[in-house]
Amino acid sequence: MSDYIIRATAAEGQIRAFAATTKELTEFARQAHNTSPVATAALGRLLTAGTMMGVMMKGADDILTIKIEGDGPIGGLTVTADSKGDVKGYAYNPEVMLPPNEKGKLDVGGALGIGVLSVIKDIGLKEPYVGQTILVTSEIAEDLTYYFATSEQTPSSVALGVLMNKDNTVRQAGGFILQLLPGASEEVISTLENRLKEITSITSLLDAGNTPEMILEHILGDFDLEILDKIPTQFACNCSRERIEKALISIGKKELQEMIDEGKTIEMNCHFCNKNYPVTVEELKGLLEKAVR
């Protein structure tokens, strides 16, 4: 089954909901970045959140970036998503290894440590929207719940999870975001809160064979759930040789000349997908001619 996101509403428009299965894109990220199990779990959770938050945006060219920077050994995570289901991301220190936490789970909170969550939305305005909150647990889902409440004034429930196989490949990954819209009744709020208390972990639901549709039906079935959209999602990077060359031209003649003088092929690396682009001395000379300063 390929990865996808379900967009839905419930309770006559008082609740909006998103649920996703992201096993393949998380496994793609694991292979691209050679992430350790705890880094895979952290990055997979944020990629899952990023792709769901990306499809919340309306414009075809809208871009969402989520950054987490902490004092833990992983350093941080960056994820970028568009409104069409494409997402990419990386961990600052992908090889970090940590013992399990006290619950015997991968210690994402310990890997990230104390820090800050930033959400940047570039939606075609003069300045991008930037919302910033502290990390409350550093487990990512609770931090995003706190972000939605404080920065977007939207009461939300966020669940994110990554389950690993014994060989450290990804067994399951996915999540949901449920949001109460303005005017939601007290009855809807209390019923939803009680229903959410019954939910086991998102990964155990996925591992039991539940699809995103079934998970939303399980939580919101009594609220006249209406599924609006099924959106494919994938890890997709838009890096290219042309972009790398533009970046090199932009650094200026002095730096380019220094690279040429070293007389070696250089390797340019894309942070997001870890692809390397070799650039020869002859190619650098060609770029030097195009540089304006």
Each PLM stretch: what is its role?
Residues 197-293:
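Cys/His-clustered metal-coordination modules, chiefly Zn-binding fingers
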Residues 1-229:
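Interaction interfaces in information-processing and related assembly proteins
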